[in-house]
Amino acid sequence: MSQKAMVFIDGGWLYRSRTTLFAKLGRENFEIDYAKLPRVFCEDVANQLDEDISLVRTNYFGTIPSARSGFNTSKQDAFYDFLEESCGYETDIHEVDVGTDENWIKMSLAATMLFYAAQPGAYDIAVLIGDDSDYAPALRKLRLMGKRVQVVSARLDGKHVNPASSLTTKHRVSDFPTLWLDEHAAEVRLVRERVVRSCKQCGREEETTWAGPEFFCSDCRGRYRYRGNA
């Protein structure tokens, strides 16, 4: 019987840690392939264990600023919808005041890890994509509950150097060596293929790299922008 893995992504940390991927592969046109991201690290765990791993759930935790004057949330809303509809993620998004977003993410992520750990047969291995030492108490509890832990970190996240080294060794919260995001940069990079799609509005076919669930041709997008500026 395969081991069940559940992935927990600290969206705030992952956004900041893109700098490590930029440094590895260049900033221009770099995008993360969110559909591949959890699978890449579950496959790595499977290779370490030399047994099958079943990815049962990917949880993404993020925020939307509620107190920033004039801030348009439509782009973030569309991104979170994309994670759910196209990548199969479960998202937990909080409206927060600017400056307190990370605390909400940390509390929600830790609570969710422990909640599912308490459900019989929900998962065997927790894969944490994030590396703040604030997670150490929750990760220790997971191990006491018989769960195994894999930490996915970055060597530089904009604030700290190698924080996960301290997290996994000093606090003894991981069962596996830390996996480094920058070492898997090429694997998690989104490579867009050009395909022909039909416009949802007019039915016209056009070549595009857009992979979202709905596609609108350049003419329809242009007319929409024109009306929006009128």
Model-derived regions, located:
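Domain-level signal for Mg2+-assisted phosphodiester chemistry and nucleotide/NA-binding surfaces
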Residues: M1-N103, L144
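Nuclease catalytic cores that cleave nucleic-acid phosphodiester bonds
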Residues: D81-G228
